[in-house]
Design a protein with these regions (language model features):
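Acidic Gly/Asp/Thr-rich repetitive segments characteristic of extracellular carbohydrate-active
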Residues: 9-47, 52-53
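Extracellular beta-strand/beta-solenoid scaffold signature
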Residues: 56-59, 89-114, 137-157, 179-206, ...
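Beta-strand repeat scaffolds of extracellular/surface proteins
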Residues: 12, 47-49, 62, 73-76, ...
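Mature N-terminal, pre-catalytic/accessory segment of carbohydrate-active enzymes
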Residues: 1-2
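Right-handed parallel beta-helix/beta-spiral solenoid domain characteristic of secreted/periplasmic
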Residues: 62-144, 168, 173-179
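Activation segment
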Residues: 18, 34, 55-56, 132, ...
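Right-handed parallel beta-helix
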Residues: 68, 72-77, 119-130, 159-175, ...
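The right-handed parallel beta-helix/beta-solenoid scaffold, focusing on the short coil/turn
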Residues: 5, 42, 55, 67-69, ...
Length: 238
C-alpha cells in the first residue's frame, strides 16, 4: 500500500518547481495541485494568509472511507483564500433537456472549487470567493450573465459519489446568474449529470454528503442547493 502524502501550498514563499512535500518546499499555486493525482489518505494543506487570486481548485480524485483525501489549512493567520475571479471554467451538461424549455441545461460555469466525480474528499477551513468585479455591461439580473459557483460538486460517470464533506468554509461574493436556476450558480451547488454509460456505472447520484459549519453570504443565485438531476423525469409529481 503506497504511503499517504501531504502537499503544502504557500502563495507567498512557495514555488511550483518544488515538490510540495514540506513547508520549506511548498508549491506556490493551485495549478500545481490540480496537476496531482491524489490518492486515498493524501492531504493538501494551504498556508494561512495565502491568497490564490484568479486561481481555482478542481479535483477528480477519490479517497476511501477509511482514508479520505483532505484539503485544508496550516499555520497561523487568516484562512487561505481562493478567489477564482471568474476563472476555473468547465462545461456543465445534464445530457438532456430539463422539465421546461426555458431552463438552461448546459453551458460554461466558473467554479472556485469543483469536485467532479470525486468521492471521500473533505474540503475544510478555507475562504472562497468568485466575483469578477465590475464587468462592463454586466448587471445583477443580466439573463446571459456568467454562471459562477463557490463550490460545485458533480456526479456523472462514477455511479454513486460518496463521502463528500464540506466543513468550516466561508463562501461569499459569488455573483452567479440568477435566472439559470439549474446551472451551478451560488455558494454550494450539487448536480447529477447524465452518465456516458449508465448501464455500466449505474445512475449518477450522491450518498453520505456532509456540509457543516459553513458560512455563506452575498452569493447568487443560491446559498446551498442540492440542485437537480438528469433523471428529473422519474420524480415528476413527487
Amino acid at each position: 500500500m503506497p504511503l499517504c502524502k501531504t502537499y503544502y501550498v504557500n502563495a507567498e514563499t512557495g514555488r511550483d518547481s518544488f515538490d510540495g512535500l514540506s513547508e520549506a518546499t511548498a508549491f506556490a499555486s493551485l495549478r500545481a495541485v490540480n496537476r496531482l493525482t491524489l490518492q486515498p489518505g493524501d492531504r493538501v494543506r494551504l498556508a494561512c494568509g495565502s491568497v490564490f487570486a484568479g486561481q481555482y481548485l478542481h479535483l477528480t480524485c477519490c479517497g476511501s472511507k477509511d482514508a479520505p483525501i483532505v484539503v485544508g489549512a496550516y499555520g497561523d493567520g487568516p484562512a487561505p483564500r481562493i478567489d477564482a475571479d471568474g476563472q476555473g471554467i468547465w462545461y456543465q451538461d445534464y445530457g438532456c433537456p430539463l422539465d421546461s424549455p426555458t431552463h438552461v441545461y448546459r453551458g460554461y460555469v466558473s467554479s472556485a472549487v469543483l469536485l467532479y466525480d470525486a468521492a471521500y474528499v473533505t474540503v475544510q477551513g478555507l475562504e472562497i470567493t468568485n466575483h469578477s468585479g465590475a464587468i462592463l455591461g454586466e448587471s445583477y439580473s443580466q439573463p446571459d450573465k456568467m454562471e459562477r459557483t463557490g463550490v460545485a460538486v458533480v456526479a456523472k460517470d462514477k455511479g454513486t459519489c460518496r463521502g463528500i464533506t464540506l466543513r468550516d468554509l466561508a463562501i461569499h461574493d459569488v455573483n452567479g446568474n440568477v435566472y439559470d436556476k439549474h446551472m451551478n450558480n451560488g455558494g454550494i451547488y450539487m448536480t447529477a449529470l447524465s452518465p456516458a454509460d449508465e448501464a455500466a456505472t449505474g445512475p449518477a447520484r450522491f450518498a453520505d454528503v456532509l456540509v457543516e459549519g459553513c458560512y455563506l453570504y452575498r452569493v447568487s443565485r443560491w446559498g446551498l442547493a442540492v440542485g437537480y438531476t438528469y433523471a428529473h423525469a422519474h420524480f415528476q409529481g413527487a
